[in-house]
Amino acid sequence: MNPTTQKLVEQNAPAQLVDHNLVPETVCPGVLYEKRPARNLKGEVVPGLYNVWISLDNPKQYNSYTTDMVKGLILAFRAASCARDVASVVFTAVGDKAFCTGGNTKEYAEYYAGNPQEYRQYMRLFNDMVSAILGCDKPVICRVNGMRIGGGQEIGMAADFTVAQDLANFGQAGPKHGSAAIGGATDFLPLMIGCEQAMVSGTLCEPFSAHKANRLGICMQIVPALKVDGKFIANPLVVTDRYLDEFGRIIHGEFKTGDELAAGKELMKRGEIDLSLLDEAVEKLCAKLISTFPECLTKSFEELRKPKLDAWNRNKENSRAWLALNMMNEARTGFRAFNEGNKETGREIEFTDLRQALAKGMPWTPELIESLMPGAK
């Protein structure tokens, strides 16, 4: 700050600032809140200005969010929103395996399954979390350090920007595990990648690569994260060296198969994961954002968020009601199957068995649910 501006601040700034946070600053297990010095485009620290890093910290469960973590995220985004010295928010997670895989399946299966009135209250918190991200007074950058799946994809899409390491996978999981992606995905995906690709992602539940996410427009930038013999290389499990196959179909960003996949896996074993380029890209984006008029930037991202907000606000309450009632049958079954299954039995029910039973008019009963669990005979 130059001397003239500094003198004006000393003469005119309030001696005591009002605290606009809802509650005093707290630390929630599973959510990290860290203020890091902001840097300009030259890489120099800007005294008195910061970027907040809000990180999910549950790596043993792929950074899935518990109920307490959801509450912590709401408060964290509120605190960052109110912080006068904060320029941007970086939303990320601990480790290099997962940004977030959605709600905590153990909690879903063992507490919320069969408890629609409880899950309805949980969904109030979930909705408030998504709204806190969409309503943050600072630009929000999703730093994708690993897989962004299910509810993790939904909260990630609520951010303004996505920067990802290229080993990360993206996608939805709802219909495979007893739910529907109506916690934001069905609102955001058609806007971001088009109706057809949104239908593919939201119903088939097939993950796609960071390279494909970048091509589809759900991710603004990707960076390599795998080092082999000290050199960064592109994700060896994904086609990155050509755009079309012999029939003119786009294959860039698609997963490799056959011998190519086997060779890619061998290359993966030789490498090590290094997220330094991801951090560099995120810091550079933060520096670009700080090099703008603050209110003009705020107005710009508030306006550009409107398509997401319009869809989200139109649907979130009836989505909450349906998800609560769904805990009585399909969600109760799917989340239990995932929680109780293992590598040997699998973590999904036999879907055709359920469909055949329902086709015969079988009502939902506890016995039916038990018969569908992985390993049941």
From Swiss-Prot:
One of its GO terms (biological process) is menaquinone biosynthetic process. Disulfide bonds: none annotated. It catalyses: 6-oxocyclohex-1-ene-1-carbonyl-CoA + 2 H2O = 3-hydroxy-6-carboxyhexanoyl-CoA + H(+). Pfam families: ECH_1. GO terms for molecular function: 1,4-dihydroxy-2-naphthoyl-CoA synthase activity; 6-hydroxycyclohex-1-ene-1-carboxyl-CoA hydratase activity; hydrolase activity, acting on acid carbon-carbon bonds, in ketonic substances. GO terms for cellular component: cytosol. Keywords: Hydrolase. Its EC number is 3.7.1.21. The keyword Hydrolase applies. It comes from the Bacteria. The keyword Disulfide bond does not apply. Pathway: Aromatic compound metabolism; benzoyl-CoA degradation. Involved in the central benzoyl-CoA catabolism. Catalyzes the addition of one molecule of water to the double bond and the hydrolytic cleavage of C-C bond in the alicyclic ring, 6-oxocyclohex-1-ene-1-carbonyl-CoA (6-OCH-CoA) to yield 3-hydroxypimelyl-CoA. Homotetramer. This is 6-oxocyclohex-1-ene-1-carbonyl-CoA hydrolase. It comes from Thauera aromatica. The gene is oah.
